[in-house]
Amino acid sequence: MEYLLMYTAGKDPQPYDPSDDNIAEWSADTQARGVSEYGERLRPGEDATTVKVRNGQVLVTEGPFTEAKEWVGGFDIIECDNLDEAIEIASKHPAARFSSAEVRPFMVWPDAEPGHRVVPHGFPEQPTGGKRYLMLVCVDPNGEEGGSDDVEPWVQEMDGRGVRLFGEVLRPPEDATQVMVRGGSVIVSDGPFTEAKQWIAGIDFLEVRDLEEAVEVAAAHPMARAGLMVLTPAWPFDVEDDHVERARREAPELGRRSEPALGVAS
């Protein structure tokens, strides 16, 4: 089974202690076990951009999609035997101690080709050719009704342009599991990380020229009309880095937006 791990503030966020960040150890363990497909840290919530189409107009707003401004700070895609193993893997990630890790299974399609994976084999070794964004494909009860919900033409176009690197539909939020570690104990609860009426239905990982192109790609997705899309740039870092020094170096970037201000486009 393939699972998406999303790292969020959760309901009981703890102060981040870079001296206690064991991400290098976690990464080495998942690689050695052969369960890791790919993962990225993401820019802070201020750099998220929400895109939706209403009445033919592309509406672009800064920030995450929820009123509470909850955001996804990073993700990993893993393949393991079952949910219990996925929870065990998530519980060892440093985010489980400082915040929360959501475990959500990907859809399994009966007509999928044998050996199909969300992340293509060899992808992590490919060089970066542009700016990368995680795009959250979200359901919005206030979205437009009617219209085509066939995403395949969009997938074929974006794959052909080389801007969509991979993506897949997720199981519904009822199948989400929250994992936290507090006081050395693993705390597991059911449901998604946010109680907002909008919910994450799938993901796509994009590589584009800039935010303007990312918005254009997102707006072309059928779910931009029925729902909304959230674009957050990847924030790569070296897991072997001195995390205390990295946190000091990156501190000035927190709490402010580094992505361009866009407003409304048509």
Describe each PLM feature range.
Residues 1-266:
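Conserved, structured core segments of small domains
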